[in-house]
Amino acid sequence: MILQDQIKIFCYSGLIPFILIPIISWISPKIAFDYYLILLFFTWSIMMATFMAGTLWGLSIKSNESILSSTIIFSSVFLLSLFITFSAENYSILCLFILLLIYEYIYFSERKLIEKTDWYKEIRFHLTFSIRICHLLMIGFIFTNQ
């Protein structure tokens, strides 16, 4: 298996929970609430954003660019994690929207670093687009079922 195929498999495998959780939540809200699927979605999204910040860090170093974008993402994800953990109120829609903005920032930061890799740029576009839709679906689900 060539490197491009391995990267595609890993990239799209990471997308599976982003897709399945909103689908299950919309089909059966009871399952979503009984099995804490909203929290699972948050957790998965935060883990993936952290992972993407790490890959952005590596790409920045390899390209001899500033690691400021990665640092901003790590800080944002960390602060959002603390906010989710310690907030007494239900700010899930706000937190999902912030995560959506973090993924946008990751995409635009990474896009500059992968200019010469067209096949990977295409994958990142499809993944980020899908992640946007999934976050919007979860925001809609939470808004509808409050």
Segments (PLM) and residue ranges:
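Alpha-helical transmembrane segments of multi-pass membrane proteins
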Residues: 18-28, 109
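N-terminal membrane topogenic signal
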Residues: 1-14
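Hydrophobic alpha-helical transmembrane segments
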Residues: 24-25, 80-89, 141-142
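Membrane-helix boundary connector in multi-pass membrane proteins
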Residues: 88-96, 107-122
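Hydrophobic core segments of alpha-helical transmembrane domains in multi-pass membrane proteins
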Residues: 44, 94-105
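Core segments of alpha-helical transmembrane spans in multipass integral membrane proteins
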Residues: 13-19, 40-86
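Short juxtamembrane and helix-loop transition motifs at transmembrane-helix boundaries
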Residues: 1-2, 29-38, 53-65, 90, ...
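Final/C-terminal transmembrane alpha-helix of multipass membrane proteins
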Residues: 124-145
